[in-house]
């Protein structure tokens, strides 16, 4: 009787398929991907260890030198920025801060 895709019988059938049939394929895919990622991670770690063994002590000395040689200049994050709206606000504040002269009586 109900022929629309929103009919409860169609929705129930789709949910059964989703849980029973399609879920197996999804689980198998996730398992394959996770296994491959684990293997890649192990390969990367082994390559890193081999590189460190080849470089040996020289790598440790280079790291110490690079830390000592590069004291970075502190970047100030306070103050006015270069944006157009900041320039406008700054100019407006400068105008307001100047005292306006009043008319004096003679």
UniProtKB/Swiss-Prot annotation:
Feature: compositional bias, Basic and acidic residues: 62-72
Region (Disordered): 1-21, 52-106
GO CC field: nucleolus; nucleus; preribosome, large subunit precursor
Pfam name, any one: YBL028C_N
Feature: compositional bias, Polar residues: 1-12
InterPro entries, A to Z: DUF2423
Basic residues compositional bias, start-end: 83-106
Miscellaneous comment in the UniProt entry for this protein: Present with 6210 molecules/cell in log phase SD medium.
Homology family: Belongs to the UPF0642 family.
Protein name: UPF0642 protein YBL028C
């Amino acid at each position: 009787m109900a022929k629309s895709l929103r009919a409860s019988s169609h929705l129930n059938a789709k949910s059964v398929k989703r849980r029973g049939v399609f879920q197996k394929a999804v689980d198998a895919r996730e398992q394959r991907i996770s296994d491959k990622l684990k293997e890649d991670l192990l390969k990367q770690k082994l390559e890193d260890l081999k590189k460190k063994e080849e470089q040996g002590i020289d790598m440790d000395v280079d790291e110490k030198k690079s830390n000592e040689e590069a004291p970075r200049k502190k970047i100030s994050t306070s103050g006015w920025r270069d944006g157009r709206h900041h320039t406008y606000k700054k100019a407006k504040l400068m105008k307001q801060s100047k005292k306006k002269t009043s008319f004096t009586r003679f």
